[in-house]
Swiss-Prot record:
Membership in a protein family: Belongs to the 2H phosphoesterase superfamily. USB1 family.
Function: 3'-5' RNA exonuclease that trims the 3' end of oligo(U) and oligo(A) tracts of the pre-U6 small nuclear RNA (snRNA) molecule, leading to the formation of a mature U6 snRNA 3' end-terminated with a 2',3'-cyclic phosphate. Participates in the U6 snRNA 3' end processing that prevents U6 snRNA degradation. In addition also removes uridines from the 3' end of U6atac snRNA and possibly the vault RNA VTRNA1-1.
Enzyme class, spelled out: lyase
Annotated positions binding AMP: H122, V123, S124, Y204, D206, P207, S208, F209, H210, I211, S212
Keyword hit for Lyase: yes
Annotated binding of UMP, by residue: Q166, Y204, S208, F209, H210, I211, S212
Protein name: U6 snRNA phosphodiesterase 1
A molecular function (GO) term: lyase activity
Predominant location category: nucleus
Regions of compositional bias (Polar residues) in chain numbering: 1-13
Subcellular location: Nucleus
SUPFAM superfamilies: LigT-like
Subunit organization: Interacts with PLRG1, CDC5L and PRPF19.
Length: 267
């Protein structure tokens, strides 16, 4: 039996976005002074606490409390000014899609009871990377420029597949994209170019584009492959109007950095 495909999902945030496999690195040419030049320290008067409390730092990322997100543990430590950043195509779940999930989850829980639904749904175009706060807006502008020429398109995600993250600490049930793969590759190519400009980790060489539906802590791929996977696929295939339900319009690319969202409409 082949192992479950790897998928990068981060351990923080409500949507379990792509996992950062490399910590944020300094942008080339920044953060250093020339040899022979000694930086001259400047003295600053201390700011009263009463004033500081009025202006909370805008560089501070979201609070890192694993108890608030299912006990998941960050793969990379939270540091002041570092923001987990993820690029994806959002999918807005309608009532019919929720009905499909209501049929799939109980069946999957017969094999792995600890499975829970994702809080939101998307197709990832990047891994999760660590971006410095002052790079967010320049990075988003580069992304917008690269996305400007892309047309909106339809894709179909109807193949049930089991995924794990690289550390095998979490398992996901997803619907793999069966049509529209070429358009996703084109988008990833441009996202990767933006990543390289900021010395960030690019996406996987042979990505399996998908919408994650449910997840659990730990490696449950052995329990979910085989009989469970077959039964889940039968539910999808036999679900009323599943062909139309799982044909999705990709009309925007979204970037989430910390608790900030940036949307880039496709033409």
């Amino acid at each position: 039996m082949s192992s479950a495909p790897l998928v990068g999902y981060s351990s923080s945030g409500s949507e379990d976005e792509a996992e950062a496999v490399a910590a944020g690195r300094s942008k080339p040419g920044t953060g250093f002074h020339r040899c022979g030049q000694n930086p001259v320290p400047s003295e600053k008067l201390p700011v009263p606490d009463s004033v500081l409390s009025m202006f909370p730092s805008t560089e501070e990322g979201p609070e890192d409390d694993s108890a608030k997100h299912g006990g998941r543990i960050r793969t990379f430590p939270h540091e002041r000014g570092n923001w987990a950043t993820h690029i994806y195509i959002p999918y807005e779940a309608k009532e019919d899609f929720r009905d499909l999930l209501d049929a799939l989850l109980p069946r999957a829980q017969m094999f792995v009871p600890r499975l829970v639904l994702m809080e939101e749904f998307h197709v990832s175009l990047s891994q999760s990377v660590v971006l410095r706060h002052h790079w967010i807006l320049p990075f988003v502008q580069v992304l917008k420029d690269r996305m400007a020429s892309f047309q909106r398109f339809f894709f179909t995600a109807n193949r049930v597949k089991i995924y794990t993250n690289q550390e095998k600490t979490r398992t996901f049930i997803g619907l793999e994209v069966s049509s529209g793969h070429a358009q996703f590759l084109d988008l990833v190519s441009e996202v990767d170019r933006a990543m390289k400009e900021f010395d960030l980790t690019t996406f996987y060489q042979d990505p399996s584009f998908h919408i994650s539906l449910a997840w659990c802590v730990g490696d449950a791929s052995l329990q979910l492959e085989g009989q469970c996977l077959q039964e889940l696929q039968e539910i999808v295939d036999e679900f009323e109007d599943s062909e139309m339900l799982l044909r999705v319009l990709a009309n925007q690319v979204r970037c989430k950095s910390g608790n900030k969202f940036f949307s880039m409409p496709l033409k």
